Amino acid sequence: MNAQELRSKTPDQLRDQLVALKKEAFNLRFQQATGQLENTARMRAVRRDVARIKTVLNEMAASAAAN
């Protein structure tokens, strides 16, 4: 998922996706703690996706406030 794809979505869609990613991150942390996590790179990818979504949401909020 890249920033261009995210910018084409509505804020509600982004918030829904953010909730889903946070749930996934929670589950990945549990898997890591119990030694069941095989793909540790997924944790990094999820964390960065969350950051991308938050960045795009903040950009949208800033542009809405400026108008």
UniProtKB/Swiss-Prot annotation:
Care to name a GO molecular-function term for this sequence? structural constituent of ribosome
May I have one GO cellular component term? cytosolic large ribosomal subunit
The signal peptide here is none
Entry superkingdom: Bacteria
Keyword entries, A-Z: Ribonucleoprotein, Ribosomal protein
Q: Which Gene3D superfamilies match?
A: 1.10.287.310
Transmembrane feature ranges = none
UniProt-listed GO biological process terms:
translation
InterPro entries associated with the record: Ribosomal_protein_uL29 (IPR050063), Ribosomal_uL29 (IPR001854), Ribosomal_uL29_CS (IPR018254), Ribosomal_uL29_sf (IPR036049)
Similarity field: Belongs to the universal ribosomal protein uL29 family.
PANTHER family assigned: 60S RIBOSOMAL PROTEIN L35/50S RIBOSOMAL PROTEIN L29 (PTHR10916), LARGE RIBOSOMAL SUBUNIT PROTEIN UL29C (PTHR10916:SF0)
Task: Spell out the protein name for this chain.
Answer: Large ribosomal subunit protein uL29
- Per the UniProt record, the source organism is Cereibacter sphaeroides (strain ATCC 17025 / ATH 2.4.3) (Rhodobacter sphaeroides)
